[in-house]
Curated annotation (Swiss-Prot):
Task of the protein: Catalyzes the phosphorylation of the 3'-hydroxyl group of dephosphocoenzyme A to form coenzyme A.
Lineage: Bacteria, Bacillati, Bacillota, Clostridia, Thermoanaerobacterales
Pathway field: Cofactor biosynthesis; coenzyme A biosynthesis; CoA from (R)-pantothenate: step 5/5
Protein name in the entry: Dephospho-CoA kinase
One record GO biological process: coenzyme A biosynthetic process
Length: 201
């Protein structure tokens, strides 16, 4: 079994790349989905987050409103740090279990995580694949996808590790600034060598 860590900044197009990899046969573990799951009512991180940030982050049904929580933590570095301290260990534990439960030993598992490096998830993988995009495209994508203003989009981008730092951890870089066909070509080339190698190691 091989484990790839797929990362990139918000709006870099990680989801596009993980979608291509899923079609090629990879098992995708989406860290954002895991994060959402552990915040659900009755799940691992729910009580701790509500105790820390107050009931004002809840919607009418008592669920954590991620937009409300986001507006708090992305305006205050200390609060973001506190949220990460609560959630990151639980996300790592859950993903470790998901990898351990995979029965197909020839499978390539891809951990799709914006915070792969910051959380320490990169220590679980054999290779780190970094998706990069030019800053103007990144801002535009975040604004369109999340309905943010330019200022809000920049705030989210700047809250993450700078690209120059992420590059230091990357084994391979996928440039997603151009059209989808170019991105697919890069991903297929990486997949072919990685997938082939998994059978001969």
């Amino acid at each position: 079994m091989r484990v790839v860590g797929l990362t990139g900044g918000i709006g870099s197009g990680k989801s596009t790349v993980s979608g291509i990899l899923a079609k090629l046969g990879a098992k995708i573990i989406d860290a954002d989905l895991v994060s959402r799951e552990i915040m659900e009512k009755g799940k691992e991180a729910y009580n701790e987050i509500v105790d820390c940030f107050g009931k004002e982050i809840l919607d009418k049904e008592g669920n954590i409103d991620r937009k409300k929580l986001g507006s708090i933590v992305f305006s205050d570095k200390e609060k973001l740090k506190r949220l990460n301290e609560i959630t990151h260990p639980k996300i790592i534990d859950k993903i470790k279990k998901m990898i351990e439960e995979e029965k197909d030993k020839d499978k390539v598992i891809v951990i799709d995580a914006a915070l792969l490096i910051e959380t320490g998830l990169y220590k679980l993988v054999d290779e780190v694949w970094l998706v990069v995009v030019d800053i103007d495209t990144q801002i535009k994508r975040v604004m369109e996808r999340d309905g943010f203003s330019c200022e809000e989009a920049l705030k989210r981008i700047k809250s993450q590790m700078p690209l120059e730092e992420k590059i230091k951890y990357a084994d391979f870089i996928i440039n997603n600034s151009k059209d989808l066909r170019k991105t697919e070509e890069q991903v297929r080339l990486l997949w072919q060598r990685f997938d082939r190698r998994s059978y001969f190691d």
